[in-house]
């Protein structure tokens, strides 16, 4: 069990959007199961899975695909690489995103040559840091003279590449054909890409998505890597709540790869090479590790025909993507984190639980609903009853390899987070000693079914 008292963690915009997408998708699946909406499942010859749901409410199709790879599939020293693909997969193909593909390839090759030399200089700087000769390898004043020369060469190559690039062409093709909502997100366990297209543009979606899987070109790789690093700096490094959230997470998970942030550690992101990205892509973006999902105004047979025509062009991967071998160790002691920030006092308590699909996960979902919402026990007990909190919540989060249960609340002005903590434990003890009344349980079940 883990017990923490920390300020409430605020998610970044992209994390919130990703969470919303997941919520909408999971809500739809729950409704589909409850209403027995038929989901057609097909498997292409290359191992790719196709899920189809026919709905003729509107003349549109929500199309997406999931690569079953996230930050938990990374290795130490390469954290953030899964999230980087969320950016790189929009850079185009040999026919999308460039005016001169051959010139583009020549510039990319020249960039890699310069970067190889820069990495050699960076190894020297890390050795200088290890010996105490410099205090920070990232500071401009600590760069070696040769590294600075190479950086100038690389900047010139970037300028040359801009002359042959067609910026955001992938997005323009979609929007020019009536598509909307094109986006992507990365979590610990998956990376998803999605957009909405008019029903009569489904074949275009099939071509566009299969083309970027079959012929991806990772243009502006290092510039985009720097964008990701800046994204991390703005959302994590520059905000105390972001830093606390990262510390919170890394303390909770001791041995499992959930320990590191999805965006990656600050020293890892600048060290990711294009060669590493190419290898990662070859392993985890193979057809047998991808699921296509189409929901909307479609005919399953026609959609399957399109999928075979376009996606079966992609050869099956040579290797099976490995599972995550490291499991979370059993933790024997309570951990507590106290942090000060410019926010209302809050208490959060987390327990290690079970992963998605585990037989106990459903009972924990129900428990979360019993405790949460404005009709739940925590709100009634802590907000309306003892009035130590202005809000209170509970939730079970089941991830692919492990899960956690969270109870928390925001302290009312003049009250302490310790009082919120005590109130939460009081409600938990009641659940341990008394059965949940049938009427209360039935009300919660209706939420799901």
Range-by-range predicted roles:
Residues 218, 225-226, 233, 245, ...:
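Non-catalytic, conformational "gating/processing" segments within enzyme and secreted inhibitor domains
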Residues 35-42:
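Cleaved targeting-peptide boundary
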Residues 53, 58-74, 80-82, 97-211, ...:
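M16 family metallopeptidases and their MPP-like homologs
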Residues 18-31:
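Bacterial N-terminal signal peptides
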Residues 10-18:
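Short Gly/Ser/Thr- and charged-rich N-terminal loops/segments
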Residues 79-91:
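Active-site recognition of the HExxH zinc-binding catalytic motif
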Residues 233-235, 249-250, 319-377:
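His/Glu-based metal-binding/catalytic segments typifying zinc-dependent metallopeptidases
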